[in-house]
Amino acid sequence: MHGGGPPSGDSACPLRTIKRVQFGVLSPDELKRMSVTEGGIKYPETTEGGRPKLGGLMDPRQGVIERTGRCQTCAGNMTECPGHFGHIELAKPVFHVGFLVKTMKVLRCVCFFCSKLLVDSNNPKIKDILAKSKGQPKKRLTHVYDLCKGKNICEGGEEMDNKFGVEQPEGDEDLTKEKGHGGCGRYQPRIRRSGLELYAEWKHVNEDSQEKKILLSPERVHEIFKRISDEECFVLGMEPRYARPEWMIVTVLPVPPLSVRPAVVMQGSARNQDDLTHKLADIVKINNQLRRNEQNGAAAHVIAEDVKLLQFHVATMVDNELPGLPRAMQKSGRPLKSLKQRLKGKEGRVRGNLMGKRVDFSARTVITPDPNLSIDQVGVPRSIAANMTFAEIVTPFNIDRLQELVRRGNSQYPGAKYIIRDNGDRIDLRFHPKPSDLHLQTGYKVERHMCDGDIVIFNRQPTLHKMSMMGHRVRILPWSTFRLNLSVTTPYNADFDGDEMNLHLPQSLETRAEIQELAMVPRMIVTPQSNRPVMGIVQDTLTAVRKFTKRDVFLERGEVMNLLMFLSTWDGKVPQPAILKPRPLWTGKQIFSLIIPGHINCIRTHSTHPDDEDSGPYKHISPGDTKVVVENGELIMGILCKKSLGTSAGSLVHISYLEMGHDITRLFYSNIQTVINNWLLIEGHTIGIGDSIADSKTYQDIQNTIKKAKQDVIEVIEKAHNNELEPTPGNTLRQTFENQVNRILNDARDKTGSSAQKSLSEYNNFKSMVVSGAKGSKINISQVIAVVGQQNVEGKRIPFGFKHRTLPHFIKDDYGPESRGFVENSYLAGLTPTEFFFHAMGGREGLIDTAVKTAETGYIQRRLIKSMESVMVKYDATVRNSINQVVQLRYGEDGLAGESVEFQNLATLKPSNKAFEKKFRFDYTNERALRRTLQEDLVKDVLSNAHIQNELEREFERMREDREVLRVIFPTGDSKVVLPCNLLRMIWNAQKIFHINPRLPSDLHPIKVVEGVKELSKKLVIVNGDDPLSRQAQENATLLFNIHLRSTLCSRRMAEEFRLSGEAFDWLLGEIESKFNQAIAHPGEMVGALAAQSLGEPATQMTLNTFHYAGVSAKNVTLGVPRLKELINISKKPKTPSLTVFLLGQSARDAERAKDILCRLEHTTLRKVTANTAIYYDPNPQSTVVAEDQEWVNVYYEMPDFDVARISPWLLRVELDRKHMTDRKLTMEQIAEKINAGFGDDLNCIFNDDNAEKLVLRIRIMNSDENKMQEEEEVVDKMDDDVFLRCIESNMLTDMTLQGIEQISKVYMHLPQTDNKKKIIITEDGEFKALQEWILETDGVSLMRVLSEKDVDPVRTTSNDIVEIFTVLGIEAVRKALERELYHVISFDGSYVNYRHLALLCDTMTCRGHLMAITRHGVNRQDTGPLMKCSFEETVDVLMEAAAHGESDPMKGVSENIMLGQLAPAGTGCFDLLLDAEKCKYGMEIPTNIPGLGAAGPTGMFFGSAPSPMGGISPAMTPWNQGATPAYGAWSPSVGSGMTPGAAGFSPSAASDASGFSPGYSPAWSPTPGSPGSPGPSSPYIPSPGGAMSPSYSPTSPAYEPRSPGGYTPQSPSYSPTSPSYSPTSPSYSPTSPNYSPTSPSYSPTSPSYSPTSPSYSPTSPSYSPTSPSYSPTSPSYSPTSPSYSPTSPSYSPTSPSYSPTSPSYSPTSPSYSPTSPSYSPTSPSYSPTSPSYSPTSPSYSPTSPNYSPTSPNYTPTSPSYSPTSPSYSPTSPNYTPTSPNYSPTSPSYSPTSPSYSPTSPSYSPSSPRYTPQSPTYTPSSPSYSPSSPSYSPASPKYTPTSPSYSPSSPEYTPTSPKYSPTSPKYSPTSPKYSPTSPTYSPTTPKYSPTSPTYSPTSPVYTPTSPKYSPTSPTYSPTSPKYSPTSPTYSPTSPKGSTYSPTSPGYSPTSPTYSLTSPAISPDDSDEEN
């Protein structure tokens, strides 16, 4: 309901939200109660004689059947009736197939005979389970089930005593017996399931020991379940109220309503019934048959068959995909769609209709580019615009426009389609005969056509990240495609080859406001995914910019003029031309400088920038113009290209966004495109065949290179044939060969490519596109010109397909380049047929890959999002999920948002100790250096003051500590970190803004720097709180930034490098603080979804299988998408598990020792070192069959240490491979030992010497002595020795580990190539140095054993098997490992994702203390609500579980709320807005009855004529551009950050600001006719929202009666205070008194002219004479809405220069001038009495009291009683607070400026009980009203909340002071002698006290008739917030004040600091504004 307006006819009240959803199983009774078909449905037919049949399947009581009919139950028609359930009484109960498994579990937990729980509920284990599984009933059942599984006897009462293994005293036992477990002690059957039937079988029961097996009928189960008690139900995880076990058996079957199973009417034929109806018919048929058979007493087997069939039908109705059961089919053979199939899957009910729906107000068509649109616009075809509508409410301001649209109707554009009257009637203008007759009234809605400037959401699928849906402004254009700016295609990932996009038109102003403030394209320029812009300059603009900014581009005057025409922000000044003679010429760079916004500073390089130049001698000159410098918004040097204008971090666009804001950046994009594209039109850019031709020398080169490459390949082939090729370690011969060939060919391609590149001229158009980065790469050029190169399939050369050859055209076994896919032609030359075929093979693979990848990554993304969708930043800044579990204590561990951080280098990390000291230590000994950098007085101070020197030493010490810390955090010395606030750039900005001359000494005191930085870092708070934990957390969160801050803003660098002045330094600190605060992550931000998208989107870009074929000896690991899948699935068996083993000490540097360790790790079996084996029959060892062994065998047999007699004649001879033995450092002895250890005495093993030429093992079986005996006696079936030996042989070769770790099959050893694996050490000089050390990488993992090996570095050694790390090292380690692995996967192909997203995923997976996979097995096993789980996967299973256990869903997550159509607690939905009812009193009615509100009416009338400063007010001074305007500060908790996105916008109470619009309301939605340019404050008439729109508020409408609920009821006490003289208890007040006519149009109990107490008294208008005829309040001529009284009518504009208080038109009693009258427009800032900008020239308070404003300190100093020296006002007196003269700070409700404060009204006597600080005027409970909040200051910008001196209860302030007593007769307001003109009332008499009733505090300072205060006096400047005569700097004669003379045309009351050019703005204000 929220979002749009109410549907027609419905109430406008919001519906109550659903707070939780309770699941359960329906009991049979409830089903019958709910059913509308009494007696159940008995007939399988639907109709009888053409009528629906009662009791049939289309029972008319169940819902509407015909379109025209009505429902018999609720009499609703088809749209109204929701349908009603019926029921079928089943003849016999059947199992519910959804609960079958649950049924079995419960059966196994309770006794088969007496239904008691098999485990006593007093068992401590059960108690433990109950305690542990609170709120997780499913867990409880699982645990109880595990306990009961082992029990096969139901424990009886007698075994009680010894049950817990504890002897219990007799008494206890009796007790337990009584409340008894008292089982029956019988044996329990095993429950088995087959199909849909359950069997119970007993094993050996005592009585008769044969087995017994019976079929368990559902009745029997029902009986067992029925007897389970409620307590035991609870133990079983059921919830007896919602789900008893016996309800899981179906006895009464509910029949779904007709609307769920509608019949399809085919033309001509009968109705086609829904699948469900068919199924129900089957059930009813078989049910009736079963009932008949039972009654007729049919045979048991017949009934059993029937039951079986019934069971089948009921089961297939629920689930038709049951394993092991036939499908229920229709006659055609199509399986029926069961209830389960309706819910599950993507197209099912949950995902297809609840989570995602089709929507109205959307459009889709093809997109085309249009560079002339702004990036946030979208061109919409007129045909679409005329069809899509937006409902606009009619107000007095838009009535004429809407009336005109209605007149045009639907036929012409722009027009309107419908009118919705305020009673909900729709008038369709398409069919209305004469739309022009229709008259609109305020409150109607008009559905008008979409028009220019509407806000829409534009989207392109797939929506991979939040930049795929952005807000655009509509621009109606002809023809039929959407047009969009080229730069926006990047985030949408769109191109114009036929892509279509979707457009959605939001239907409510709230939605609109949100899109405008949160989702507009310019706000999305920088992505939080990788903190860089996502939009850059592309295509022709980019090509052109590179050409345009070259050194030799000059433009003539005419050209310059033409280009400037396209520069929307041009200020009219043409810069000085670069060349004057012979004729003026401008350079391209100069024109580009005009486009660059603001004072941006930036240094980048051009794409062709040579790296060596930066250190070379010409680094400042940049010969190729390749160094880009933008300084102060001017392009000084350099050619711009993709690096500076593309989507890279730190590009010009990025800096513009961060420094200038999104709006200016938007213009930057538009201006570049319009200007540059139009230059390109003149310049031209083309490409042709000519660009692809190189010179003949190059072609010669290319031929030679290819020839040589072929020759090389042939050589390698020959080597391989001749077996001369040495395999590289870790590779087979074939792999080595392939690698070498590949390398040769790739080198050839690269070499030819680079020679082709070199041959191209500077003006080549291919080259210009590549260089600018617009299209293509170097490889593309070289493929066009030189060689296409090697084609690969699956990372290898084209494989053999046809009998050892690739194509039939080649000979067999041809390994040459041509036949294996090397294409030696270029695209220009054209490919030969075979080349073409190979090229196509390579290309095809890419296509398949892409297709497969899309599906894979789409699913990954969905899982990621589902697992993190509800993770958000809460208002305590923690990151939590929907069940309020903390996932992170601060988002990203630093609490900052991803879009606002940048890459920065930490200055102190890298430099050596010497360099560090030189750069950072403030050297106060070197006087000469000091004089160069600091001013003289500072030098003296520094040199002489020891305290200062200590401070500076301490500063350096601190930095040294920081450096130590950093070197622990970044041990590799890699210091690129993401931090907010780019300090170096901010300093540069400061130097430019304050015009710092880096050659002059600075006036910035070093101590000021040190202290400033200290103070600043105290202000940067991420974690509030003073407890040690919070302090530690705060330190951790801001550690890096603080280190960065201290090292950049250290005194030495400030003095030497930056030379900032004191002023500039202050600005810098302020800027850092505000930027830092803006970077903090917003509460309500859905960071979970953000992280999921940030990871899913790069995954989509990843290629599926990443091959790297140059793998020399690096082992290959899974990468890309497959690896990502492994990680988030937490697969137990990764494809390539691997350890990276780092070594310690010597072994790391010494290859031999490293090899030792390698051998210790690598698993070696005998087979790996065996050359060959043989079995011989060799009965006589002394003369062996193998002659060569004779010699050494004899040695053994001469002196045998074994029983020669037992030796078997069979011999196993193993010959070992010497090379492998030495490789693995094995000796024969070790092997023999292993064999002996394994087989012991059963084998005899002898071996020869390690140095023998053949290494031989001889193995024989030893026969035991007993064996010998047995053989003769009995022939046992024994294996023959030779067979046995053969078995031993295979066992030995494969299973016997010689050394190493079984899991580790192979170990590679190599020296690291990349720095990240080298060992980084810090030398004693403090420099980083990378050492090459040997690294082992393994196939297979065994972390535990490897870590315990000696010489292995246990700290750095890691595994890539996540599960293993978890088991070995625990959860924290696995979190880090997971983060590293994810980082590797993503960074492998060069992407970068901000750490915070990876961290959030890792934390989500590990925050429960175990690994949660991002699959249904992880996500759906969490404690989230069932609705969320069922929206992910396993829909029906989850819902069944939830029902069986009676779970409930607390509706806290995103999915749940979306399903139920509620606002999810996300973003703007995670807080509430409170309306401050008090503020509503100040709302103004919009007088709708003023004559002339017709066509041109409002213009002059509402707002005064345009010339008056108010009409022409400029948007620049509206309160929300004015951080310092306390008018807004007063009611908004975030003063000073008016520009902070989201602070003011979300300020909960901003809605009724001093101006009718709160900053949160976008000015766009109430066009103020008087001043089209002004967003609001100039309109005193916009009421507080909802005011004027409801008819009950219009004073002239009959409904406005004083007692109407919306009106102002005079009796309501809360209303009384607003009229000072209105005292409900005053005796003469009676509602019937003659001058109180409630129906008079002017009646307003709060209007001063209505004086209930005495006709002659109106305290606020002393000149009011009751006898003046025009003032009889009931007289018809006096109506506040009559034109002459319109408070804004031109003659009243108090600010109009001609206005003078004495002018005849000035009538102080006009209602608009009574400060206490609510109709006195307080909603415009110029009228708000509490706003400092309140213009005191308005005579809005009693002007006849000559010296009337006593509390204002600048009050006429000559008044005797208020002379500033009088003790009661002396600035030193304790109760005087100069900064808030009239505000009582300690009482939130006391504001003398509020008209309602009238101390004499009895209800306001401060001592009377009703006067409480909670007085409604300032409800302190409204969020922004914390009286102690410093920003709460209604009247004075300087207000101090703690000043005790103004508390009405403070002794000095007693209203009972003798002079003044509210009850004394002298002050009774009704006493006749009290008349403002009576002599006793002399304001100068001392008894006039500020609390006296006539004192109108709303004007702080001005008395119009007093000669001293004429408003034209030059010193009178009441609105400057600084103005306070007591402030020391202010001297009333100072000329500063003159700028603020209210009559000077620049003065406008709505802005305290308006005259922007005036020097009077003091730096304080400007600080606040930044």
UniProtKB/Swiss-Prot annotation:
Positions annotated to bind DNA template strand: K346, R358, R1416
Residues binding Zn(2+) 1: C71, C74, C81, H84
Alphabetical keyword list: Acetylation, Chromosome, Cytoplasm, Disease variant, DNA-binding, DNA-directed RNA polymerase, Host-virus interaction, Hydrolase, Intellectual disability, Isopeptide bond, Magnesium, Metal-binding, Methylation, Nucleotidyltransferase, Nucleus, Phosphoprotein, Repeat, RNA-directed RNA polymerase, Transcription, Transferase, Ubl conjugation, Zinc
One Gene Ontology MF term: microfibril binding
Phosphothreonine sites (modified residues): T1840, T1854, T1863, T1870, T1877, T1885, T1894, T1912, T1915, T1919, T1926, T1929, T1933
N-acetylmethionine sites (modified residues): M1
Keyword Zinc attached: yes
Positions where Omega-N-methylated arginine occurs in the chain: R1603
Enzyme Commission number, as recorded: 2.7.7.6, 3.1.13.-, 2.7.7.48
Region (Bridging helix), start-end ranges: 832-873
Protein residues bound to RNA: R67, R460, D499
Binding site for Zn(2+) 2: C111, C114, C154, C184
Residue windows of the Sequence repeats: 1593-1599, 1600-1606, 1608-1614, 1615-1621, 1622-1628, 1629-1635, 1636-1642, 1643-1649, 1650-1656, 1657-1663, 1664-1670, 1671-1677, 1678-1684, 1685-1691, 1692-1698, 1699-1705, 1706-1712, 1713-1719, 1720-1726, 1727-1733, 1734-1740, 1741-1747, 1748-1754, 1755-1761, 1762-1768, 1769-1775, 1776-1782, 1783-1789, 1790-1796, 1797-1803, 1804-1810, 1811-1817, 1818-1824, 1825-1831, 1832-1838, 1839-1845, 1846-1852, 1853-1859, 1860-1866, 1867-1873, 1874-1880, 1881-1887, 1888-1894, 1895-1901, 1902-1908, 1909-1915, 1916-1922, 1923-1929, 1930-1936, 1940-1946, 1947-1953, 1954-1960
Sequence positions bearing Asymmetric dimethylarginine: R1810
Modified positions (Phosphoserine) in chain numbering: 27, 217, 1843, 1845, 1847, 1849-1850, 1857, 1861, 1864, 1868, 1875, 1878, 1882, 1896, 1899, 1906, 1913, 1917, 1920, 1927, 1931, 1934
Effect listed in the UniProt record for changing K1859R: Loss of acetylation and loss of regulation of growth-factor-induced gene expression
N6,N6,N6-trimethyllysine sites (modified residues): K1866, K1873
Subcellular location: Nucleus; Cytoplasm; Chromosome
Biased composition (Low complexity): 1546-1568, 1608-1959
Quaternary structure and partners: Component of the RNA polymerase II (Pol II) core complex consisting of 12 subunits: a ten-subunit catalytic core composed of POLR2A/RPB1, POLR2B/RPB2, POLR2C/RPB3, POLR2I/RPB9, POLR2J/RPB11, POLR2E/RPABC1, POLR2F/RPABC2, POLR2H/RPABC3, POLR2K/RPABC4 and POLR2L/RPABC5 and a mobile stalk composed of two subunits POLR2D/RPB4 and POLR2G/RPB7, protruding from the core and functioning primarily in transcription initiation. Part of Pol II(G) complex, in which Pol II core associates with an additional subunit POLR2M; unlike conventional Pol II, Pol II(G) functions as a transcriptional repressor. (Microbial infection) Interacts with herpes simplex virus 1 protein ICP22; this interaction causes loss of CTD 'Ser-2' phosphorylation from Pol II engaged in transcription.
Disorder this protein is connected to according to its UniProt record: Neurodevelopmental disorder with hypotonia and variable intellectual and behavioral abnormalities: An autosomal dominant neurodevelopmental disorder characterized by profound infantile-onset hypotonia, developmental delay with poor speech, delayed walking, and impaired intellectual development. Additional variable features include feeding difficulties, dysmorphic features, and visual defects.
Family (UniProt): Belongs to the RNA polymerase beta' chain family.
Entry protein name: DNA-directed RNA polymerase II subunit RPB1
Origin species: Homo sapiens
Phylogenetic placement of the source organism: Eukaryota, Metazoa, Chordata, Craniata, Vertebrata
